[in-house]
UniProtKB/Swiss-Prot annotation:
Keyword terms of this UniProt record: Ribonucleoprotein, Ribosomal protein, RNA-binding, rRNA-binding
GO annotation, biological process: translation
The protein's role, per its UniProt record: One of the primary rRNA binding proteins, it binds directly to 16S rRNA where it helps nucleate assembly of the platform of the 30S subunit by binding and bridging several RNA helices of the 16S rRNA. Forms an intersubunit bridge (bridge B4) with the 23S rRNA of the 50S subunit in the ribosome.
Gene3D superfamilies, sorted: 6.10.250.3130, S15/NS1, RNA-binding (1.10.287.10)
Protein name: Small ribosomal subunit protein uS15
Cellular component aspect of the GO annotation: cytosolic small ribosomal subunit
A molecular function GO annotation: rRNA binding
GTP-binding as UniProt keyword: no
Length: 89
């Protein structure tokens, strides 16, 4: 389940550190967080969709690694990001 292009562009615009920024950890984590939320809703309705469940767990792991990287490189950006996204940490 891919994100709608308009939603993805909106997220990129909100979290970009500069014009045209799509690769910063903040943008990547924000996009992954939205995809995780969407797939979580999908899984509530389709409990036995194991392919989606596996993809969801992979995304959660990828987001966790990116957050760990950001925490190790710049703790202030990390704290600002988890507060903006409402992630518990």
């Amino acid at each position: 389940m891919a994100l709608d292009a308009a939603v993805k562009q909106s997220i990129i615009k909100d979290f970009a550190t500069s014009e045209g920024d799509t690769g910063s950890p903040e943008v990547q984590v924000a996009v992954l967080t939205q995809r995780i939320k969407d797939l979580t809703e999908h899984m509530k309705e389709h409990k036995h969709d194991f392919h989606t469940q596996r993809g969801l767990l992979a995304m959660v792991g990828r987001r966790k690694r990116m957050l760990t990287y950001l925490k190790n490189t710049d703790i202030n950006r990390y704290r600002a990001l988890i507060e903006r996204l409402g992630l518990r940490r």
